[in-house]
């Protein structure tokens, strides 16, 4: 008997978030005994972005995608599928050994200019951003409150081309006067 062929599929779900959405998607994967290799989810202002990388038997992949398409339609979300080659997956797994850093940006408020400066410096240094997370509460539109604080965490990976220069540049280019 010949071993079953497997497929790697990256599933991306976007749309209005609601309770039970992730459960609905993963229940279909469970029905076909798929293995979840990676999963990530973000919700910004009730807008969901869910990514699932799964491994399944080739004979089940069509059924999985069909059921997920119907489920996405009934939930009013968009779903996309991307085949991942074994080589792409292995290359991704081999990136695990790269250095990881957490960069935290603090301020009374954080502007697009400051975030742009941080991300530009990271890119120039050859660093890749794995995740960005707001750590503080939601910022009110009325910015009169002097107690308002903003904090964003960047999870980055790689080896900086020049770590000392990166630290010096960061402090100079990111600071903005408080208004």
Roles of regions detected by a PLM:
Residues 97-132:
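Surface-exposed interaction/gating patches
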Residues 89-110, 143-151:
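Short, low-order "capping/linker" segments at domain edges
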């Amino acid at each position: 008997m010949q071993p079953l062929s497997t497929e790697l599929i990256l599933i991306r779900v976007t749309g209005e978030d609601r309770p039970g959405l992730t459960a609905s998607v993963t229940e279909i994967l469970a029905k076909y005994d798929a293995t979840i290799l990676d999963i990530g989810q973000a919700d910004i202002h009730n807008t969901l972005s869910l990514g699932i990388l799964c491994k399944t038997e080739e004979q089940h992949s069509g059924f999985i995608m069909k059921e997920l398409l119907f489920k996405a339609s009934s939930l009013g979300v968009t779903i996309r599928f991307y085949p991942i080659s074994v080589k792409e997956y292995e290359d991704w797994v081999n990136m695990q050994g790269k250095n990881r850093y957490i960069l935290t940006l603090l301020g009374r408020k954080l502007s697009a200019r400051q975030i742009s400066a941080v991300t530009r410096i990271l890119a120039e240094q050859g660093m890749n951003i794995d995740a960005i997370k707001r750590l503080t509460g939601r910022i009110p539109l009325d910015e009169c409150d002097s107690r308002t604080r903003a904090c964003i965490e960047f999870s980055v990976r790689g080896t900086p081309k020049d770590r000392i220069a990166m630290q010096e540049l960061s402090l100079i280019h990111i600071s903005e006067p408080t208004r």
